[in-house]
């Protein structure tokens, strides 16, 4: 199996991607398991930040790297929290604090104006100086609920209602979520690109 460093310390992302990529002969190792610190996310877009993270992990480890930068864009907030989704509630942000801040921010927004979209950009670098990284983007439309529901997933999943499924992302099974989520879409594109190239 080809060892690949996953440029994240987010346990939820590691679990989700490692299980999906193991079928393709890729042994995913979290950067934290290899003593790699987090790259500074100075980009203004998901793509820029994913490339920064992948390049940093590949440079430190000498391994191919996959990085994910993802977040939630809420229409009524002009796309916020966007690239700041993981630290929306401040420096000591947690999933719960971020979720509560978003619900509070949207409390006066009518139900018919609570559309949102999860975005995920996956970047694969063959090596740290790779001039042609594979860049794959997935997006997943939904609606922000007024109350959390479900115990699965992570992040904003309990308040992200998926109209096509009639439930929140946190109420979906891992398999259901992987089949339709932003990360599942980006991963499918990445696997197709790896297969073909």
UniProtKB/Swiss-Prot annotation:
Tell me the superkingdom of the source: Bacteria
Its EC number(s)? 3.6.1.66
Where is Mg(2+) annotated to bind?
A: 40, 69
- Positions bound to substrate: 8-13, 70, 154-157, 177, 182-183
Tell me which GO cellular component terms the UniProt record holds: cytosol
What does the cofactor field's note say? Binds 1 Mg(2+) ion per subunit.
Q: Quote the HAMAP family the UniProt record gives.
A: Non_canon_purine_NTPase (MF_01405)
Q: What does this protein do?
A: Pyrophosphatase that catalyzes the hydrolysis of nucleoside triphosphates to their monophosphate derivatives, with a high preference for the non-canonical purine nucleotides XTP (xanthosine triphosphate), dITP (deoxyinosine triphosphate) and ITP. Seems to function as a house-cleaning enzyme that removes non-canonical purine nucleotides from the nucleotide pool, thus preventing their incorporation into DNA/RNA and avoiding chromosomal lesions.
State the protein's name.
Answer: dITP/XTP pyrophosphatase
Q: What is the native source organism of this protein?
A: Shigella flexneri
Provide the taxonomic classification: Bacteria, Pseudomonadati, Pseudomonadota, Gammaproteobacteria, Enterobacterales
């Amino acid at each position: 199996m080809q060892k690949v460093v996953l440029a994240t310390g987010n346990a939820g992302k590691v679990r989700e991607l490692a299980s999906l990529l193991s079928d393709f002969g890729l042994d995913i190792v979290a950067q934290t398991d290899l003593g790699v610190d987090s790259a500074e996310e100075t980009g203004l877009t998901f793509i820029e930040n994913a490339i920064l993270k992948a390049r940093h992990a590949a440079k430190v480890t000498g391994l191919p790297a996959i990085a994910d930068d993802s977040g939630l864009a809420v229409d009524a907030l002009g796309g916020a929290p966007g690239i700041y989704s993981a630290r929306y509630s401040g420096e000591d942000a947690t999933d719960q604090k971020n979720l509560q801040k978003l619900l509070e921010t949207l409390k006066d927004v009518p139900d018919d104006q609570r559309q949102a979209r999860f975005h995920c950009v996956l970047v694969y670098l063959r090596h740290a100086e790779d001039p042609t990284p594979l860049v794959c983007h997935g997006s997943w439309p939904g609606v922000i609920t007024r109350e959390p529901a479900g115990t699965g997933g992570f992040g904003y999943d309990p308040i992200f209602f998926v109209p096509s499924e009639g439930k929140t992302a946190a109420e979906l099974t891992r398999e259901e979520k992987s089949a339709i989520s932003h990360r599942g879409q980006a991963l499918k594109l990445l696997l197709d690109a790896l297969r073909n190239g």
